[in-house]
Regions:
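Glycine-biased, small-residue-rich flexible motifs in mid-sequence functional cores and linkers
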Residues: 2-255
Length: 255
């Protein structure tokens, strides 16, 4: 675990952290960032919405920020991975919640985890509220996917309003996600009608790049005969294009 003195987005907070501890890729801080937060007990409908919406955010090279909690937070992080930042209330040597351990360890390795608390710090209830201010400060806008009236997500909504951060919510039926419905009714949040149009406000949606089967195969095989058996004349086409190099009975990629 390493530390940095501060992050630009935190400097204008009334109570900025004195130090930020991190694991992972600090380059993600340079990306446009959108928070995706919400209920720990999300509905199947919310999960399906996230699968579509967050996948589009990822294609637009937007980094998804969350708290790594159960439910909406970790679902958004999994879809966005490795373009995701998780802000934790606990120290980063304390993996919490344990149910998300695999996903959190992946974030440590290939995405970015942040905390204002030292390595082995065990979070207390008020630390989660303090953590939420960092999520809001870090993000350009806040998406609250689902929330009850009395929830941490509604406290985050109040924080977002105090920081003049736009809030967006998903459409929900009456008596579902009453917190986000209230934000809409009181004109404190905007409704995401169309996922693609929403994402286009923040960046171009790039087509998903498919891994090249032949080049991928060469990552673990350099025997020319075996490669020819599988891909035939395509191997020589790739050689002419300068994508592969053949020397004797061996072959390797040039990219």
């Amino acid at each position: 675990m390493k530390s940095i003195e501060n992050i630009d987005e935190f400097k204008n907070l009334l109570n900025p952290p004195s130090k930020i501890y991190y694991k992972g890729n600090l380059e993600l801080l340079k990306a446009r960032k959108i928070a995706v937060i919400g209920s720990r007990k999300m509905s199947v409908y919310t999960k399906n919405c996230l699968l579509e919406l967050v996948a589009l955010l990822k294609k637009a090279k937007i980094c998804v920020v969350s708290g790594g909690a159960l439910g909406v937070d970790i679902q958004a992080a999994k879809i966005a991975y490795p373009q995701t930042i998780a802000v934790f209330a606990n120290g980063l040597d304390e993996v919490y919640p344990k149910a998300n351990a695999n996903e959190i360890l992946n974030i440590y390795e290939n995405a970015l985890a942040l905390s204002e608390n030292e390595a082995n710090y065990k979070a207390k209830p008020y630390d989660f509220l303090l953590r939420n201010r960092l999520i809001i400060a870090l993000s350009e806008v806040i998406i609250i996917a689902q929330a009850d009236l009395k929830s941490g997500s509604m406290q985050s909504a109040r924080l977002a309003l105090s920081m003049n951060k736009p809030i967006y919510v998903l459409p929900h039926r009456k008596n579902e996600s009453e917190g986000t419905n209230l934000l809409l009714a009181t004109k404190k949040a905007n409704l995401i009608y169309d996922f693609e149009e929403f994402v286009k406000m923040f960046g171009e949606i790039y087509p998903e790049q498919k891994e090249d089967e032949l080049l991928n195969f060469l990552k673990h095989e350099d025997d020319l005969e075996k490669v020819l058996q599988k891909f035939g004349d395509k191997v020589y086409e790739y050689e002419l294009e300068g994508l592969v190099e053949i020397f004797g009975v061996k072959i390797k990629t040039c990219v």
